């Protein structure tokens, strides 16, 4: 098991592993902290977590959904200790075809805690320069993540932009002294891709077992009126934005490029994000299956299996 998280992250709720099987395929696993081992349904802790709903991350501190003893210790999937987890384990070919999937309650022991920068350095290493099994595992995961990402985008998943910044604070006054853009790397996309795959896989699993009682997450198709301003602005620069479906929107955004203004496309994607309908949690029995889809991810079903420590 390997952890890939930001530097200093303490509430670690996911790990990844990738093992080469005797038949040449890969065993790929996403393991998520088993919060239910410590929090019983209907308990005082469960009710308090429900009222908070999520952990809140401020510039200089974090307001936890669950007590710190759980979030940063007992439930946190830290390296070199045993932890309770739920695992989704796939058998995947080197070409990215999923052969089968299994779901298990597990006890995991993470052997490496990597920052995104460290994971990126593994990805960037030439294949011939390292025999380290951790490097090999991360490189295989990166290769699969690229394949899965391409499949999602080809199916119509959107690649939008949301500017992220981090503040540097004065150690005494806590006043901001600098603001820096947060740089996303391929290692970030690697983790994101497998979390999305886990959430989609679990959504399908719970629907098979609880067809009318599954808690899912839907993203309705946007209303055209919400996009009118953006469509008008893009048309002024000679581009047509098509929102008939997510694939057409993705293709029209990809085509809206100005060599003289390299940030034009990113600006369009930021504005597109603001035109979207909000995603919603819902019970599968409340909507028709055609209304379960997640527009932004181009996924017929989706849920939030990951991040149980913080939501």
Language-model segments: what does each one mean?
Residues 1-311:
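Electropositive polyanion-binding surfaces
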